[in-house]
């Protein structure tokens, strides 16, 4: 096993993604929102839109890109978890703009790809 746990490595890349998105002008709202259904890594606001962010990282693309790691099951969990977060914030998914983005990180953080509207609810 390596020097760092999977969670520590995940936190490191989430921090990198958070800093990257803040530099892009997004306003940070929440991190590691956890429910029985699932977890959302980062939550931001861009203008009037709430942005739920899944952070994925890969050492290399040998087994696919980081963005390809977001499965259909994961997408469903993200949507349900986002609805819970919105409800706790007294916001309705029916009258607020929101989207799901992926920040894909490769090459130990030297390559960051921000994919907006990466996940659909369908």
From Swiss-Prot:
Q: InterPro entries under this entry?
A: Restrct_endonuc-II-like, tRNA_endonuc-like_dom_sf, UPF0102_YraN-like
Family classification: Belongs to the UPF0102 family.
Identify the Pfam families for this entry.
UPF0102
Please provide, alphabetically and separated by semicolons, the GO molecular function terms listed in this UniProt record. nucleic acid binding
Highest taxon, organism lineage: Bacteria
Q: What is this protein called?
A: UPF0102 protein VIBHAR_00890
**NCBIfam families annotated for this entry?**
PRK12497.1-3, YraN family protein
Q: Which HAMAP family match?
A: UPF0102
CDD domains tied to this protein: PoNe_Nuclease
């Amino acid at each position: 096993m390596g020097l760092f746990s999977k969670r520590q490595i995940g936190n490191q890349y989430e921090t990198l993604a958070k800093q990257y998105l803040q530099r892009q002008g997004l306003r940070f709202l929440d991190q590691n929102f956890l429910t029985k259904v699932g977890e959302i890594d980062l939550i931001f606001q861009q203008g009037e839109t709430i942005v739920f962010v899944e952070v994925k990282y890969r050492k290399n693309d040998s087994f696919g890109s980081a963005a390809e790691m977001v499965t259909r099951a994961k997408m469903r969990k993200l949507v349900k978890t986002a609805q819970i977060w919105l409800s706790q914030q007294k916001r309705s998914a029916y009258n607020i703009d929101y989207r799901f983005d992926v920040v894909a990180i490769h090459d130990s953080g030297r390559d960051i790809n921000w994919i907006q509207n990466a996940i659909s609810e369908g």
